[in-house]
A protein has these predicted regions:
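Bacterial N-terminal signal peptides
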Residues: 8-19
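Well-ordered alpha-helical scaffold segments within catalytic/enzyme domains
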Residues: 45, 49-50, 88, 125, ...
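Cleaved targeting-peptide boundary
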Residues: 23-31
Length: 187
């Protein structure tokens, strides 16, 4: 009987301990965590969309309607990756670690594999930059990556996410015009 009572008490203590641990308050959100989570969310939709388009369709551009001068699918992907690098480098106050080819991506990235690698590497670099944005430096002036003037780290962190989603929306149309359901819509 004593063993049963001791066992019952041990189970109750463990259960209560687990309940208390499960109810522990979450750490408050920070500028860094919010930006990183947002960037991860965008990356989680953008990269699979880039991977979903077959390589032979990477040069696709809509042709019916008013689409003169719009980017091809590969140019969309390269542009977002290049801007990721430029913006992240601005946040880090350094030069991009790779040739970005300006805002259009490097001419050397031609195959789907090269372009997707350039894209994934740009997101890794963007996460590195976002990790440095905090309450202390988020609104400090930094040099704008787009010419003269200044901006803030926070605005550049927001731009990383917003810019990617802007082009993601265009890429979704390119995918659908080719009979491909975007990966994020398949779930």
């Amino acid at each position: 009987m004593k063993n049963r009572t001791a066992l019952l008490m041990a189970v109750m203590v463990l259960t209560m301990s687990c309940s208390l641990l499960a109810q522990a308050p979450k750490a408050p959100a920070t500028v860094t965590s919010v930006l990183d989570r947002s960037l991860s969310g965008m990356e989680g939709e953008f990269v699979p969309a880039a991977e979903a388009m077959p390589e032979d369709k990477y040069s696709f551009v809509p042709s019916t309607g008013e689409f003169k001068g719009v980017r091809t699918f590969s140019q969309q992907v390269k542009h977002v990756a290049a801007v990721n690098y430029l913006v992240a480098a601005s946040v880090l106050s350094e030069k991009p670690p790779v040739d970005t080819g300006g805002e259009n991506g490097p001419d050397s990235a031609k195959s789907k594999a090269d372009i997707v690698k350039f894209l994934k590497d740009s997101f890794a670099y963007a996460h590195k930059a976002v990790a440095t944005i905090n309450d202390t430096n988020s609104v400090s002036d930094i040099k704008s990556p787009f010419g003269e003037g200044t901006t803030t780290r926070l605005s550049m962190g927001v731009l990383l996410v917003g810019h990617g989603f802007d082009h993601y929306g265009q890429m979704v149309e390119y995918l659908r015009l080719n009979g491909i359901i975007p990966p994020a819509s398949r779930q």
